[in-house]
UniProtKB/Swiss-Prot annotation:
The lineage of its organism: Viruses, Varidnaviria, Bamfordvirae, Nucleocytoviricota, Pokkesviricetes. This is Protein H339R. Belongs to the asfivirus H339R family. Induction: Expressed in the late phase of the viral replicative cycle. Keywords: Host cytoplasm, Host nucleus, Host-virus interaction, Late protein, Virion.
Amino acid sequence: MAGRVKIKQKELIDSTVKNKNVMNLFHEIIGSKGNINFSVVWPKFKKIKQSVYDYISTLSVLEKASVMQNFEDDKKMLELFVQKLWAAYEGYFKYPEIEKYEVEGQVNFNQVPHYVLEKFSQLYRSRINSELVTLILNSCAFLSKYNDYILKKDPYILTITPGLCFSPIPNFEDLNFKYLYNSDKNSQHDKDFIMFILYKLYTAALGVYNAISIPDIDVEDLENIILSSVSQIKKQIPRCKDAFNKIESSVHLLRKNFNTYYSDYVGSGYNPTIIMEQYIKDISQDSKNISPRISYQFRTIIKYYRDMIATKHQTMDPQVLNLVKHVEKKLDMLDREKN
């Protein structure tokens, strides 16, 4: 049954490609025009939400722990800080409108009112890029430098490393784990507990980072769009079989390297063209498999696009133009290497 759903989905994509600009479809799937794939994004959002909850809960456990009775001022400051984090969490991550449609952790988005989905779509990006999530990601970046020690609960970082301060939370340097751990007021049990809290804090922050890194799209949909568009174009451009075969066979690079592409996409400020640029670059750099004949066929395909746009008196999308120039430049480089 699942296979049949995928077949129908591909048939729908094939039909849609015939009637819509491929770059527009790409923008829609990647979500750069405000569209999001709820079946992908909602589970991702829930993972981020759970990990943020775990992070704040860990700090809350520390604040209420008996060990903090020995540090009254620190306890009060931590209590106020945790309250601020919970208030931010409530504001950013409460979406009861969608959650009430969940059945055993799954949502049939066809049954969710459009206005609810529209609201979530509008707020999604700002939520995962919120100050709260950014704080936790920065905390993760700091702690990741001590990954091996923390995961082994090795107190080396709190005892031997130079300096008097080990504060892993941005904007809250008062929470100094090195000071807490090395206090004469603590028993060995207290020290073990503090190290455990640091471990839980790091694993929760890692959970946020890993969830944030999940692509917002179905990579298979993107593959199908590329393959379907090639299928339509190849009928109109004769004697370019090898180049089209190269594109079709290389489409799996998209799946193989997509995590890297997606990281570049996020790092670029959500510029979807980055994904296509890196994908085309990977195809072009496979120089041992690109003969002068295939290079010529790639140029023919590019010329077809330019002629088609010129005939229709259209202005080429600057992003598409950049891709074309990039491919031409890479092909020139490959030609020089082979001569």
